[in-house]
Amino acid sequence: MDSDYSFSLTTFSPSGKLVQIEHALQAAASGGSAIGIKAKNGVVLITEKKLHSLVDVTSVQKISMITENIGLVYAGMGPDSRVLIKKARKESEKYYKQYKEKIPVLQLVRELASIMQEFTQSGGVRPFGVSLLVAGFDEKGPHLYQVDPSGSYFAWKATAIGKNMVSSKTFLEKRYSDDLEIEDAIQTALITIKEGFETQLTEFNMELAIIGKNQEFKILTPAQIKDYLLNL
């Protein structure tokens, strides 16, 4: 059985799997839903924030700014995401000090993927139990990437991670258009995440962020999110 090989990070099971990576992928897949949509003029990130009723929702943040033109959202284990966010910011600072310009989105994605892949084959560590959606805008335009615990990364027009990723991707396939503007992408993201929501969608149980050509990466306030919800 594959489970007999889960004791080792670097031992393949008879079916050709690295079981610890499978566990990490499952941890990411069981996390809160997160969706990314690339529009003609920017990128939208949205995620649910499902917390215990006694938790102060303002103390939990799932979407993070890395640089002025790059941000990310995670699905999976929060503590693991904090490590990767710290490393992403450090790599961005190092790039700026060396080249005196902002790190390209793909360059940062490759750095993150390399770090995550290294944790699938090194002794004394385990894979990161998170998947990331990285959104950014650089001289080549808007970008949306997904990075998985295995170190794999993909460019997407629209995608989802977390517990409702299959149904969300199916929904996005029906609604996505290459002609989407950023405002349309926000509405599409809200409708998509609402489809998988078990309770009423409010400005307090979700996060929403945008990045555009002349717009720094911005995490919207609850009041701004409420305005969009009223127009659904």
UniProtKB/Swiss-Prot annotation:
Annotated coiled-coil segments of the chain: none
Q: Which CDD domains match?
A: proteasome_alpha_type_2 (cd03750)
Q: Which domain of life is it from?
A: Eukaryota
* Recorded GO CC terms: cytoplasm; nucleus; proteasome core complex, alpha-subunit complex
Write the record's keywords in alphabetical order, separated by commas: Cytoplasm, Nucleus, Proteasome
Chief site of localization: cytoplasm
* Gene Ontology terms: biological process: proteasomal protein catabolic process; proteasome-mediated ubiquitin-dependent protein catabolic process
Signal peptide residues are none
Record localization: Cytoplasm; Nucleus
Cited Pfam families = Proteasome (PF00227), Proteasome_A_N (PF10584)
Q: Which cysteines are joined by disulfide bonds?
A: none
Q: Which PROSITE patterns match?
A: PROTEASOME_ALPHA_1, PROTEASOME_ALPHA_2
Record keywords: Nucleus included?
A: yes
Q: How does it assemble?
A: The 26S proteasome consists of a 20S proteasome core and two 19S regulatory subunits. The 20S proteasome core is composed of 28 subunits that are arranged in four stacked rings, resulting in a barrel-shaped structure. The two end rings are each formed by seven alpha subunits, and the two central rings are each formed by seven beta subunits. The catalytic chamber with the active sites is on the inside of the barrel.
Similarity section: Belongs to the peptidase T1A family.
Give the matching NCBIfam families.
PRK03996.1 (NF003075)
- Biological function: The proteasome is a multicatalytic proteinase complex which is characterized by its ability to cleave peptides with Arg, Phe, Tyr, Leu, and Glu adjacent to the leaving group at neutral or slightly basic pH. The proteasome has an ATP-dependent proteolytic activity.
Q: What is this protein called?
A: Proteasome subunit alpha type-2
